[in-house]
């Protein structure tokens, strides 16, 4: 389903730009819509709270994968380079239950885990075929400031009070720097552009002790891959 949707997006982008004239070097206001996948269980930072929680709760790491949207301002630096500044947003709420405990009435002990990411990225791209080509493959990288928020809310078990069940809500947030790598292809006309991009983001942040009874210094891995279709409005000379 995801592959079919990606093909449809690329066909639509090609239809919009195939008859356009090759573009001179221009600024671009770029918009993206795609799918963000968090780093897998074996690739996550040591002490990651999601990996630790899987020993107690029932959920999968890839339950945190989901849609992402973004916007970016791109400025040419000569014919072969381009600088960008942009922001993207993703949020995912994952329902869970305790794996080995139930309430006194036999019902599940339920909670929600929520991860929100808002990376602000500053990047530089290399365009081997130049800005004036109607087909523009590119690659590059840069630095992102990742504004994040992670929360756990619902019912929990107090293992120090004879497994008493209590309602709780734990929230942490902050901003962490991290590297970003990207690559893609763009079909460029005089006034519009479109394409497809793959982006990798890396970063992690520390959490307080209440977020994990299994880790003395729990962390949250903020990294992952983004696969997105892009559409841009080109202006200026």
Residue ranges and their predicted role:
Residues 41-60, 91-115, 147-175, 205-221:
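Flexible, solvent-exposed loop segments that connect beta-strands
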Residues 23-75, 232-237:
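Short glycine/proline- and aromatic-enriched beta-strand/turn motifs that initiate or cap beta-hairpins
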Residues 128, 133-193:
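A charged, solvent-exposed segment within the mature domains of Sec-exported extracytoplasmic proteins
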Residues 14-22:
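C-terminal segment of classical bacterial N-terminal signal peptides
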Residues 1-9, 18-19:
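Bacterial N-terminal signal peptides that target proteins for export
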Residues 64-68, 117-121, 176-180, 193, ...:
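Transmembrane beta-barrel architecture of outer-membrane proteins
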